[in-house]
Regions:
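Short, conserved, GDST-rich strand-edge loop motifs in beta-rich repeat architectures
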Residues: 2-5, 55-57, 146-150, 193-215, ...
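Asp-box/WD-like beta-propeller blade repeats and closely related beta-sheet repeat scaffolds
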Residues: 78-154, 164-178
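Surface loop/turn motifs at the tips and blade-to-blade linkers of beta-strand repeat domains
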Residues: 26-34, 76-80, 117-129, 170-175, ...
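Loop/turn-rich, solvent-exposed surfaces of beta-rich toroidal or solenoidal domains
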Residues: 255-258, 274-333
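Blade-loop segments of beta-propeller domains
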Residues: 31-40, 59-102
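Blade-terminus and WD-like Trp-Asp/Gly-His loop motifs, strongest in beta-propeller folds
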Residues: 40-49, 84-93, 97, 129, ...
């Protein structure tokens, strides 16, 4: 079976500063091709299938393509347009949400999409068009967690994979959206969501949420019975978050840091500090199953701002055993003529993530003058940070 480094569809590149290698998907089935959002892996556990995002400007949405490394073929599946894409690592089947509900599709071109759950009536009647930021399985893979965004609040709950029934765990009030729902990897009764923004009716726009009892309210833990616990973040700020593999703690980004919270009342623990003067040291991050290695993206100051959609970015690797860091990709340049006034309509942040049993990292690169899916080997990064 082929790999990204032996497939005819990939071209290997070397970062000119760090000398780290990565493979770019150079066969294009769409003008824009990206790695999955960092919460979910696009890989099947056997390494045969790799799903990726595709887009055709000016259309604002995405659909999926898939690489079959056994046949060395690429297939485009426009019918997967929607949101929340999640791959079952055991089978390579992809799940996603749209205005009709939750669907699944195998990687095989002769198969067709299958609906496994309709949206609840209260969502369909309200014109809800998606089923979550990124779907995640319960540990037993019998249910799928979703965050449903409705005019009357966010509904956090699970869909039964067999019956399609929806069980609501928690609902917010209108104007307080909870998104980025992620199931605990070890407990089917616990999930994490993000209070990322709030709607300001005076501005007619979404803004950062107001403090709640003096606490920045991004990090929220929700139980199946509807119990909600707010986690006070380090220095009262947090951005993108993810579960540790044992389900006993969470990680999140905080300016130039990755921070760990043990969810037991202990003070948050700083994992690493990786500042970028004038920019943002960490946007998104991810960790290996053994919590020894971390990867994160960040932004450089670009056209007078510290961040905008499509600005210059970087991907870095941190070795927690040695405390050393190396650039996997030193600089993603601006492409497609994007500017702060005319930013990308696509979420093209690198979104690095460990995949395939922590042997590879998938991310999004613009080093070839376009938006590309990129993949790197982890072992070279470990050697570079010993």
């Amino acid at each position: 079976m082929r790999t990204p480094f032996t497939s005819k569809h990939f071209t290997v590149h070397v970062d000119p500063e760090s000398q780290m290698e990565y493979a770019i998907l150079s066969t294009h089935i769409a003008p824009i091709q990206q790695g999955f959002y960092f919460v979910n892996s696009g890989y099947s556990d056997d390494g045969r299938y790799l799903w990726f995002y595709c887009a055709y400007p000016p259309a604002s949405g995405h659909f999926l393509g898939v690489i079959d490394f056994q046949t060395d073929e690429i297939h485009a599946y426009p019918e997967t347009a929607g949101s929340g894409w999640m791959v079952d690592p055991k089978t390579g089947t992809v799940y996603w949400g749209c205005s009709q509900g939750i669907f699944q599709r195998t990687p095989h071109p002769n198969d067709s999409p299958k609906q496994i759950a309709p949206l609840p009536d209260f969502c369909r009647k309200a014109g809800v068009r998606g089923a979550g930021t990124h779907l995640t399985f319960t540990p037993d893979r019998r249910e799928i967690l979703a965050d449903l965004q409705t005019p009357f609040g966010s509904s956090i709950g699970t869909f039964d994979v067999v019956s399609g029934a929806y069980h609501e765990w928690y609902r917010t009030v209108p104007g307080i959206p909870y998104n980025h729902a992620q199931m605990c990897p070890t407990n089917a009764n616990v999930c994490m969501v993000a209070h990322e923004v709030s709607f300001d009716p005076k501005l007619g726009d979404y803004v950062l949420p107001a403090f709640v009892d003096g606490v920045y309210p991004r990090l929220q833990i929700i139980q199946r019975d509807g119990t909600r616990t707010m986690i006070p973040p380090y220095e009262n700020f947090a951005t993108h978050e993810w579960w540790a593999s044992d389900g006993k703690s969470i990680y999140y980004c905080c300016h130039e840091r990755i921070v760990r919270d043990w969810l037991d009342g202990r003070k948050p623990e700083i994992v690493c500090e990786v500042p970028i003067p004038g920019g943002n040291g960490t946007w998104h991050g991810h960790s290996t199953q053994d919590d020894r290695y971390f990867v994160m993206d960040g932004s450089y100051p670009c056209m007078g701002k510290d961040w905008w959609r499509g600005c210059e970015s970087t991907v870095r690797f941190f070795n927690a055993e040695t405390g050393k860091i190396v650039h996997l990709l030193t600089r993603n340049p601006v492409v497609n003529g994007w500017t702060p006034e005319n930013p990308s309509i696509y979420h093209i942040d690198p979104h690095p993530r460990f995949v395939l049993h922590d042997t590879l990292i998938t991310f999004t690169a613009t080093t070839q003058g376009r938006v590309d899916l990129a993949i790197a080997k982890v072992d070279q990064l470990i050697r570079a940070t010993r």
